[in-house]
Swiss-Prot record:
Spans traversing the lipid bilayer: none
Binding residues annotated for heme b, in chain numbering: H83
Lineage: Eukaryota, Metazoa, Chordata, Craniata, Vertebrata
Species of the source: Telmatobius peruvianus
PANTHER family in alphabetical order: HEMOGLOBIN FAMILY MEMBER (PTHR11442), HEMOGLOBIN SUBUNIT ALPHA (PTHR11442:SF48)
Protein name: Hemoglobin subunit alpha-2
Family: Belongs to the globin family.
Length: 137
């Protein structure tokens, strides 16, 4: 069951939000430099406090989504509005970030628990990204 796999692995991710989220953002910025344009004053070095702080925000939002798997849109509506209407983030960036979150979690959890949950985690991140991009229509 997708839900049980997400609920099993996500608390381990959430408890390291700044580290894992920061690592995912660092990988995103390194691999996709065009995404840096939304953060003009950031220090983009690996252990930057700014990257870790924003990474924690990302993981915290995903933690909230994991608690509301039946209503991700409702749970994160204000955040989605912010990204779509105020920040005007290119919706093509969300799948890129989801990929780097997946890679980071795979690196941090090289055991079987993640192997089983990888597909479900990918679907979860795609659902969150899909909900985010729905605001752009």
């Amino acid at each position: 069951d997708d839900r049980s796999h997400i609920l099993a692995i996500w608390p381990s991710v959430a408890s390291h939000g700044a580290d894992y989220g920061g690592e995912a953002l660092y990988r995103l910025f390194l691999s996709n430099p065009q995404t840096k344009t939304y953060f003009p004053n950031f220090d983009f070095h690996k252990d930057s406090p700014q990257i870790k702080a924003h990474g924690k925000k990302v993981v915290d939002a995903l933690t909230e989504a994991s608690k509301h798997l039946d209503n991700i849109n409702g749970a994160l509506s204000k955040l989605f509005d912010l990204h779509a209407f105020e920040l005007r983030v290119d919706p093509g960036n969300f799948p890129l970030l989801a990929h780097h979150i997946n890679v980071t979690i795979a690196v941090m959890f090289p055991d079987d628990k993640f192997d089983i949950a990888h597909h479900q985690l990918d679907k979860f991140l795609a659902a969150v990204g899909g909900s985010l991009t729905s605001k752009y229509r």
